[in-house]
Amino acid sequence: MNEKNIKHSQNFITSKHNIDKIMTNIRLNEHDNIFEIGSGKGHFTLELVQRCNFVTAIEIDHKLCKTTENKLVDHDNFQVLNKDILQFKFPKNQSYKIFGNIPYNISTDIIRKIVFDSIADEIYLIVEYGFAKRLLNTKRSFALFLMAEVDISILSMVPREYFHPKPKVNSSLIRLNRKKSRISHKDKQKYNYFVMKWVNKEYKKIFTKNQFNNSLKHAGIDDLNNISFEQFLSLFNSYKLFNK
């Protein structure tokens, strides 16, 4: 995505009072190394450097990079990189967390990038509230792919009045906690196939009628419109047993 389009999609939070309210929901300590996605004008970056060991801010807008550096002139535990987060290569040999107030229009791309291309153990993001709810919806393929790798929580609402320019909708702070992948490497392709057939309701392509009924019963599913991720995993495991 080019710099111009990202600029037009950015909404900033600059009030220290509002930033402090958001920061109370983020678990950080003086040993943490943080990658910040989009430093903006440096308001969150300033709070992060005061709480953490080291902050690497990744900002595509070179003018905002300078603004952030100027705001943090009294600190030395940070760096600002003028890069596109979607092209950035996260380190594979160190422990870190990620924070970002990310653009609405590339939220899916950013989350896919940081879940599957980074090893961050905790990820905190400010995203549009409706989008956050969709990440918890087991009828959506993207949610099912994410849930296999991370636990997803909505931590708090972030009212639209916190931002400037003010967006049309409210946002929320979410946390993605890394866990041991629920899908083995050898089953990834099979899981991807199962997810896509399931969300498209192509049940006959993954189960016979008897297999389907038995799998639902084993998973304790009474309503196909209301299933947990654990129940979905039970269905997938049944599918694997039937297709050895």
Curated annotation (Swiss-Prot):
Q: Which SUPFAM superfamilies match?
A: S-adenosyl-L-methionine-dependent methyltransferases
Superkingdom, taxonomy of origin: Bacteria
Q: Which residues bind S-adenosyl-L-methionine?
A: N11, I13, G38, E59, D84, N101
Keywords of this protein's UniProt record, alphabetized? Antibiotic resistance, Methyltransferase, Plasmid, RNA-binding, S-adenosyl-L-methionine, Transferase
Q: What is its EC number?
A: 2.1.1.184
What's the catalysed reaction? adenosine(2085) in 23S rRNA + 2 S-adenosyl-L-methionine = N(6)-dimethyladenosine(2085) in 23S rRNA + 2 S-adenosyl-L-homocysteine + 2 H(+)
Q: What class of enzyme is it?
A: transferase
Q: Name one GO cellular component term.
A: cytosol
Identify the InterPro entries for this entry: KsgA/Erm (IPR001737), rRNA_Ade_diMease-like_C (IPR023165), rRNA_Ade_Mease_Trfase_CS (IPR020596), rRNA_Ade_methylase_Trfase_N (IPR020598), SAM-dependent_MTases_sf (IPR029063)
Q: Which GO terms describe its biological process?
A: response to antibiotic
Q: Name one GO molecular function term.
A: rRNA (adenine-N6,N6-)-dimethyltransferase activity
Question: Which Pfam families does the record match to this protein?
Answer: RrnaAD
What is the similarity comment for this entry? Belongs to the class I-like SAM-binding methyltransferase superfamily. rRNA adenine N(6)-methyltransferase family.
Role summary: This protein produces a dimethylation of the adenine residue at position 2085 in 23S rRNA, resulting in reduced affinity between ribosomes and macrolide-lincosamide-streptogramin B antibiotics.
Q: This protein is called what?
A: rRNA adenine N-6-methyltransferase
